[in-house]
């Protein structure tokens, strides 16, 4: 029976890829036995309740092998992956896109494809489960109690982010993380002996992982035994499973020819004969469906039913905790944050927005028990520390400060995994210039619709002495170009509070907070509520103004000072604070016209960064005071003056406009 089911997985993959004339059959054919063993013997999921929060998680880090996952989901009974959807693999509007997409297909626990990120994301799942278990489980009531499983390939393990995450997972002793390594000695360009020769198991042992070797990737009992041993090890686990890529293909197995191209009609026929598969394309024997129903769907449904009874009993035994748990199960924060939670701020108060962020962050932490995060070894520079808590580790699982170490990329992907798990609000910080190290993770936050908050400090050339390696220039423009990402660069402490509020209230959009090291003065015109619009009028000295200054962050202070100088010269000026271009762009046309009336063409945008995205607001007849070169090393006042960020220079720029 098991051999028939394994071959059903293989041929669903082969047939769908042939029909699409696109895809990666090799991993489907080689990894089918380990995937079958995992799904039918270990994985606890309920296809009728795909979002069950206590289900085991499965991450196909080798996302190019997506038909392996779709075949498993189809056979297990997930409604989203019908046979018609399998036949529509890689087609417009299908539930079976080329790489798995979270939120698009029920049963897909994470978007994967960029290699390495799946392993790192799984680390976040495991850490989320551990925190929620520590916080809410009580004796006899293991409400949060599941494993996170991964199938990865050689390419995943070559990527640096998997190494960062593996080092971190070993440090944290995340013992409910089990990685199955599809070790087939082949990559796209040829054999791994030409590009990847270290002992992976030795490396993972050094990280503090349990490791094992299954020498025959078709030995279902050996695979099952290795997984059971891993679960009892008390460590994160890597199981190397030696497989043959394209297993069963007489002329292509064991070669890179089967990695990323359909088998084609002739080789498919030969493979059918070699594996004894006497069925038409997309024909699956009834006994295969029965196998998956008994060993995946029914087993999972029984586990779900037992868990729901456990939750009901938990409500009786622990009613106060149960209220929070119920909210988490429903996908809500256990406590609602409100604007009134933030203290009022006096005009004229001066503080660096990184410090304002620390104050706001701690307001959030005091209100939300499931709010946690950390920094890439910069917590006391990014000001990301929750003051009431210590560091989280295996011995202190309830603490909410996470020390990610100098692992920016892993930090971003771990945060994604924690957000994907559900039940948590998470954040992570580093210097803004180092956002490049984790930009791929930020992109996947946005693609997956995850409300992760990124705290990026030291936001401009005002860093000064550290020089151009530490002074962001192109970073704002680059992040603003990512769809479904809200970038906030607040002007003062008041706007910083509001930006944090917007971040925590977000449901499907990640947030980037771009913050200063230098002090900024709270302006009289800044407004907590209006930050929700992305831009608003912060200063105006005449109703019939003929000049608009648009600024973000620290430059709002500069723009207001310049506007007051222009007013003293008889100028009629409006200053617009635009903490988030992304949010402003989402407003309706009437609001945009209210803030930036089309009739007023005399406009200057002011921001210490690349100028390219500002011309959409000032037009070709306006001007931008920005920076399109790298920064410099000198005391901050000198650097700012040399780059023209002075009241005198801005006033002159405005006066030179027609």
Regions from the PLM with identified roles:
Residues 51, 147-148, 208-211, 342, ...:
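Short, surface-exposed connector motifs at secondary-structure boundaries
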Residues 1-32, 151-152, 156-157, 178, ...:
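Conserved acidic/glycine
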Residues 89-95, 375-381, 388, 406-409, ...:
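Short glycine-enriched loops at secondary-structure junctions
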Residues 470-473:
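Flexible, small-/acidic-enriched active-site or ligand-binding loops
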């Amino acid at each position: 029976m098991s051999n028939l089911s394994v071959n059903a997985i293989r041929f669903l993959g082969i047939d769908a890829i042939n029909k699409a004339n696109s895809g990666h059959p090799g991993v489907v054919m080689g990894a089918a036995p380990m995937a079958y063993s995992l799904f039918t013997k270990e994985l606890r999921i309920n296809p009728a309740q795909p979002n069950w929060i206590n289900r085991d998680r499965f991450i196909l880090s080798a996302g190019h092998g997506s038909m392996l996952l779709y075949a498993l989901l189809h056979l297990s009974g997930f409604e989203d992956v019908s046979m018609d959807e399998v036949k529509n693999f890689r087609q417009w509007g299908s539930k079976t896109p080329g790489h798995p997409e979270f939120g698009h297909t029920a049963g897909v626990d994470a978007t994967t494809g960029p290699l390495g990120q799946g392993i790192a994301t799984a680390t976040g799942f495991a850490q989320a489960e551990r925190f929620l278990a520590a916080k809410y489980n009580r004796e006899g009531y293991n409400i949060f109690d599941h494993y996170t499983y991964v199938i990865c390939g050689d390419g995943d393990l070559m990527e640096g982010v998997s190494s960062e995450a593996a080092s971190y997972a070993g440090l944290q002793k995340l013992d409910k993380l089990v990685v199955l390594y599809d070790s087939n000695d082949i990559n796209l360009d040829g054999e791994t002996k030409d590009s990847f020769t270290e002992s992976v198991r030795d490396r993972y042992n050094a990280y503090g992982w349990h490791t094992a070797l299954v020498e025959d990737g078709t030995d279902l009992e050996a695979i099952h035994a290795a997984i059971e041993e891993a679960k009892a090890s008390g460590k994160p686990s890597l199981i190397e499973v030696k497989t043959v890529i394209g297993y069963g293909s007489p002329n292509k197995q064991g070669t890179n020819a089967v990695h990323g191209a359909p088998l084609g009609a002739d080789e498919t026929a030969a493979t059918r004969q070699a594996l004894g598969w006497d069925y038409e394309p997309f024909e699956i024997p009834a006994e295969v469906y029965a196998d998956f129903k008994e060993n995946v769907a029914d087993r999972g449904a029984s586990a779900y039913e037992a868990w729901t009874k456990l939750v009901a009993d938990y409500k009786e035994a622990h009613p106060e905790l149960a209220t929070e748990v119920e909210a988490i199960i429903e996908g809500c924060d256990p406590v609602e944050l409100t604007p009134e939670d933030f203290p009022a701020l006096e005009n004229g108060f001066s503080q660096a927005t990184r410090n304002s962020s620390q104050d706001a962050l701690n307001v959030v932490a005091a209100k939300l028990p499931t709010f946690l995060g950390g920094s890439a070894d910069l917590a006391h520079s990014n000001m990301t520390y929750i003051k009431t808590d210590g560091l989280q580790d295996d011995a202190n699982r309830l603490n909410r400060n996470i020390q990610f170490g100098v692992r920016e990329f892993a930090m971003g992907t771990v945060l994604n995994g924690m957000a994907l798990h559900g039940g948590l609000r998470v954040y992570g910080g580093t210097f803004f210039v180092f956002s490049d190290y984790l930009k791929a993770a930020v992109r996947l936050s946005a693609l997956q619709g995850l409300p992760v908050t990124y705290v990026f400090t030291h936001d401009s050339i005002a860093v000064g002495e550290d020089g151009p390696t530490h002074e962001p220039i192109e970073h704002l423009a680059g992040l603003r170009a990512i769809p479904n990402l809200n970038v906030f660069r607040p002007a003062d402490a008041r706007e910083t509070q509001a930006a944090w509020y917007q971040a925590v209230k977000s449901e499907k959009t990640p947030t980037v907070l771009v913050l200063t090291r230098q002090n900024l003065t709270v302006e009289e015109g800044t407004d907590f509520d209006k930050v929700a619009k992305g831009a608003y009028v912060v200063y105006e000295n005449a109703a019939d103004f003929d000049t608009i200054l648009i600024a973000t962050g620290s430059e709002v202070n500069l723009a207001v000072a310049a506007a007051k100088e222009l007013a003293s010269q008889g100028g009629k000026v409006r200053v617009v604070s635009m903490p988030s271009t992304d949010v402003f762009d989402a407003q309706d046309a009437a609001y945009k016209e209210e803030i930036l009336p089309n009739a007023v063409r005399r406009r200057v945008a002011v921001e210490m960064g690349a100028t390219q995205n500002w011309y959409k607001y000032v037009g070709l007849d306006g001007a931008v005071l920005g920076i399109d070169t790298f920064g410099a090393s000198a005391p901050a006042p000198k650097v700012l003056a040399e780059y023209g960020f002075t009241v005198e220079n801005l006033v002159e720029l405005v006066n030179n406009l027609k």
